[in-house]
Amino acid sequence: MAGNSGNVTGKDFVGGVVGQNNYAINGVNASNTGVVNATDGGAGGLIAHNTGVLNNITMINAGLVTGTGTDGDSGTGGLIGYNEGDITNSVLENTVGFEINDETFDGVVTGVSNVGGVIGINTGKIENTSLMNKADITVNVDENENAENIGGLIGKNTGTVTGGRDASDSYYKYQIYNNGVITVNGNGSNIGGLIGNNEINGSLSKGYNTGAIYASGSKNVGGIVGNNEALSARYLTLLWLILLILIKTPQSPAVLTSVAWLAQIAAH
């Protein structure tokens, strides 16, 4: 598996392996265990900005990814900052406990807006692909500022995301889930266990969240989606609600925990 273990710092569209990809990539395995830092924009643990077709690839991030972007084109993700391309038959994982040469690495994502455990902003078509986030996501908001679109998997989504079964249809081969903890310190909006902001035409199916969300100063906080604009134009169907507990305490007035949903968010 090819990979990056060095620290990478730049202004915007900073990637641990690739900054800008406009070409098709097929049959590649890659990882990042280094620190990827964008000082005035978005970052991706592996790819900062992708417009190409990705097929049959495995990408794993176990490094620290930090972005500072707040505009609509700046996305920060554990694997990809901003994805506009199609992704098929692949695995994208932001993980913890990743071992290389007896050394253990943990993926962490920090940012301001359009932050996702796997992808910051997605406008592409993703199918028969695993999107898995096991790492923590932390957003620290300065006073008088507002963070928006924070998701366990995707910060802002206008594309389609679909898992899938194996050829025998006996089990879900491609997993879509988040079990990392999302923490937003300060004012925020559109905070979701899977997607922060699912815009019109955005969809996700066959996914679930088990991660806790701590966002006491935020609005539009959901176990699956923080803000679903596709609902107003189309509909939202929950296939299976396993458990949802909303805890309100004086210390943490808006904390979602112990959430495990299998849901379909669709725009048809």
What are these regions (language model features)?
Residues 1-268:
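Surface-exposed loop/turn motifs in large extracellular/passenger domains
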